[in-house]
Amino acid sequence: MRIGRIIATAIFFALLGTPAAPADKIVPRAGHAIAPLPTDEAVRKGMVTIRDLVRTNHSLVTHRRMPPDHALRFAAQVKVEADRILATSNLSGEAQEKLRALLEEVVTGIGAVAKPDAGISPMDGLVRADEALARYPQEFDHPGWAPAQSLE
C-alpha cells in the first residue's frame, strides 16, 4: 500500500508542474466565463459574407417587400456560403460541431424567408438568423465582428 501512495503522490506532484493548457490557447475575454472557440480564415470570411447578405436583405424582409424569386436566391446564397464554410474550414471537435449548429440555425431561418409554408414565418425566420448571428461572437473568436442588426 505504501508504494501505491508514493506513486500516487509522485504523479500528483508531476501533474502540478504540468501546465493545464497550452500557452497559445485562447483565453476568456473580459466578462466571459469561457473562452471563445477558435476560428480560421474560411470561417471569418464566410461569416462576414453571410452577415452582409442578411444585412443587405434585412429591410426587404421586415417590410415584406422581398419578391419570391429574390427570397429563393437569398436563401440559396446563404446555404452555399454555409456549405462553403463547412467544406473549407479547418475547425474540428467542439468548434466544428457548434459552428455546424449555428450555421444550420441561420440557414433554417433564412430558408423560412424563401419558403414561409415550412412552418416558420419569414419574420420569425429572420429573427432566428439574426439571433444566431448575434450569438456567433459570444461562442467564436472573431475580432471586430458586429451582428447584422448593429450595422444598419
How does the language model describe each region?
Residues 57-70, 89-95, 113-117:
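Amphipathic alpha-helical segments
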Residues 68-76, 96-104, 123-131:
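Short, charged, amphipathic alpha-helical segments
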